[in-house]
C-alpha cells in the first residue's frame, strides 16, 4: 500500500498553525504543491504585497521541499542579502521544530556545534547525512559554483 504524501497546505498548517487560509491561499498553496511535486516545472507568482507570497514561496516551500527530498539543493535570492538571510533563518527554525521532525525525520540540520563538518549560517545550511542545502543570497550576491535544483526569487526589486 502506497503511503499518502503530506499535502503542502497540511504541512503549512502543522508548522505554522497561526496562518489563516482564505480561498486565495488554498489555491496558491495548491499551485506551490504542484511546483514542489514537479507537475509545474517553472512558476512565476505575481500578487499584491501582503498576501503571503513570501511566507508561502520563500519560507514554507523550501522547508517542505527539503522534507520531501533531503538531497535537494535550494537557493533563495532577494533584493537584499539581509532579506534572503531572513528567509533562510525562518526555514531553519521550521526544520528545527518538533512538528517538522514528526513529519520529516530524515531532514535535520546542525544544532550548536554538533555534528561537526556541516555548515549552518544565516546564509547557508546543509542537511545532515544528505546532499541537500539551502543557500540565500542578495541580488548583488553570487551563486557561482553552487549547483541548485530549485531557485526561488522573491522581491528582487
Regions found by a protein language model. Give the residues of each.
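SF2 helicase motor core recognition
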Residues: 53-54, 138-149
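Residue-level preference for the first positions of well-ordered beta-strands
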Residues: 42-44, 73-75, 133, 150
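Walker B catalytic acidic pair
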Residues: 155-156
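Conserved nucleotide-state-sensing and coupling region of NTP-binding domains
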Residues: 77-140
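N-terminal accessory segments
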Residues: 1-41
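Conserved P-loop
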Residues: 45-103
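Residue-level signal for alpha-helix termini/capping positions
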Residues: 33-37, 67-70, 144
Amino acid at each position: 500500500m502506497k503511503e499518502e504524501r503530506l499535502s503542502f497546505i497540511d504541512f503549512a498548517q502543522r508548522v505554522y498553525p497561526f496562518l489563516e487560509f482564505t480561498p486565495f491561499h488554498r489555491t496558491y498553496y495548491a499551485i506551490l504543491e504542484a511546483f514542489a511535486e514537479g507537475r509545474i516545472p517553472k512558476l512565476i507568482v505575481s500578487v499584491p504585497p501582503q498576501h503571503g507570497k513570501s511566507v508561502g514561496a520563500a519560507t514554507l516551500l523550501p522547508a517542505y521541499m527539503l522534507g520531501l527530498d533531503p538531497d535537494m539543493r535550494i537557493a533563495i535570492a532577494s533584493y537584499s542579502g539581509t532579506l534572503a538571510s531572513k528567509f533562510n533563518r525562518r526555514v531553519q527554525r521550521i526544520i528545527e521544530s518538533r512538528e517538522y521532525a514528526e513529519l520529516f525525520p530524515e531532514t535535520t540540520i546542525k544544532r550548536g556545534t554538533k555534528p561537526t563538518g556541516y555548515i549552518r549560517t544565516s546564509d547557508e545550511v546543509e542537511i545532515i547525512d544528505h546532499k541537500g542545502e539551502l543557500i540565500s543570497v542578495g541580488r548583488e550576491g553570487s551563486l557561482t559554483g553552487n549547483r541548485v535544483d530549485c531557485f526561488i526569487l522573491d522581491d528582487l526589486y
